[in-house]
Amino acid sequence: MIVFDNGVRVFINTSTNKDIYVGISGFGFEKDIGGILGTAHLLEHILISFDVSRFIANASTARSYMSFWCTSIRGRSTPVDAIRTLISWFFDRDGLKHYFPVSKIKYHIKELENEYYFRNEVFHCMDALTFLANGDLYNGGRLSMLDRLDDMPLILQDRMCAITGPNIVIFVRELNDVVLSLLVSTFGTLPSCPLTIPCTLPTPIGGKIIMMPSPFYTVMVRVQPSLYNILSILCLYEIYHLVDYETVNNKLYVTISFIHEHEYESFLHGSARLNFTIYKKIRLHYGDDFLMNMYLSFPCIRHDIFDYLTIINTNVSTMIPSLEQNIYQSIKTGDYIVVYPNFSNTMSNVADRQLHKTVVIDTNIVYVTKPTTVIDLMKKHTHNDMYIKYSDTEFIDYVQLALGLRRKIHKNVNGIHIRHQFSADDIKTILESETFMKYSKSKPAAMYQYLILSFFVSGNTIEDILQHRESVIKLCRTYKNKILLGKQTRYDIQTLSSFVCGIFKGPSITSEYLTDIMWKLKRKGLIYSLEFVELQKNMFYLFMFTIYPEDVTSYLTSRKLFTSRCVVVSKKCNVEDFSSMKKDIIIKLR
């Protein structure tokens, strides 16, 4: 690790697939509380800009930090080009960027609204901790920010000026004189302390149960943010599933999730203890996303994480019991937060400023001081690869499992690939639990992508498909049939979601071209993401949720590279209507 004079920390991470990865602590959704919620997320969308033909890049905003990364495409750019590109998001010739024109901000706010719509249609993205800390359940920004459009340039400028050296963590895959010079002349020029220190009054958030959609019964227990507690949590994270951490307002919470309600109840009542046995040597081999989160969340970790290995493996037998004592003391005093699974649309007693409703109650749980049972947690095993075909009847369940456990989903033409550390029995236990089954069915919008895909690739009518909705994934398995487009180029339907999808054909269509279209639509504020699957040579199935379906359709139908197409445009309504979808697609069975 290299530390600049202003406090910027630079790590060489040869195992990452990113040429440069930059994180900024104290710069996430929490920063917006008391101001305009969504400012941090808006800034992320404005800053990131790159040539999709030369680079792969992305950015994200979390509760307490923001992160940005960029990597070069081999043969089209170099790692140094990627580093220069990321630096250009923050710095221009005059130094740190300060100018944000209203004309550009407007389209990014529209993009934020599309992201909100996407995340609420497909995922459960509500943040219980930020809500309890006086934020909203969703803090990523909404279309209502347009009401303060003229104020946003100055607000964004002030936010940029709040960036300081000690808040910056940088990972680079390779470090040489050129890269070091680029970093020193840019991030190395940031101030070492803020010009102003805002006065914030922390909101007490302990002793609450919040009822919201969740695949598990989750308890967030506040513990002291000491170095030994942090290292102990990292040990538990390496050994066990469903153990993690959260930070809010500089407070540290150990999160422990339970599949069964009786285990959750016995833990809170004190009648059961958790089996926190460290049965193997700790290695601290984490991915770069986890490491970035860790360095940004815990400023007390001032060295490379591997420098702590000897301390951990020498003292783990005393560190873990100390953390346990802290956990049980907080449980006894009620200093914890519970996320209790609830899927009712009518049950609520509070609402945030965006009128998202939920249930929040006090924890009035009597603690028993004599535990009689021990709860064994799910252990992490060696890495396994799980491949699920689109034809698998449990496809959606596995997707929800991966999302609920924060696992990356890799897609290809025939299915998805998930890398995990679960045993077969543990996966079966989760998938068969009543709470998880309710969770996986609580967001049906994702099914529309496969309903329409099945219509295009199979010989089934839309009526047949709707009658077998529960097994629709099986119906849309990868057929070897030849698809011939008919005369009708558009179907208008009504569903519970607003989206545009369809099949598009053209001799020059490539995945790179579709990726470029996605970014152009994003910059126009028309979509958040675009999913596509190649059905056969030069023919793709496209799907995108959008609150502007007509604008997206007009853009797609004006692309000259699409020589043939059939578009499905869905208007959001309370009642579904697929009656317009008469089979005009010819399937040549083979």
Curated annotation (Swiss-Prot):
Pfam family, one: Peptidase_M44
Residues binding Zn(2+), per UniProt: H41, H45
Any one biological process term the GO annotation gives: viral life cycle
Cofactor binding note: Binds 1 zinc ion.
Presence of the UniProt keyword Ribonucleoprotein in the record: no
Record EC number: 3.4.24.-
Keywords, alphabetical: Hydrolase, Metal-binding, Metalloprotease, Protease, Zinc
Active site (record annotation): E44
Cofactor list: Zn(2+)
GO MF, any single term: zinc ion binding
UniProt-listed InterPro entries: Peptidase_M44
Main enzyme class: hydrolase
Record carries keyword Cytoplasm: no
Functional note: Seems to be involved in viral proteins maturation by cleavage at Ala-Gly-|-Xaa motifs.
Protein family: Belongs to the peptidase M44 family.
Record protein name field: Probable metalloendopeptidase G1-type
Organism the protein comes from: Rabbit fibroma virus (strain Kasza) (RFV)
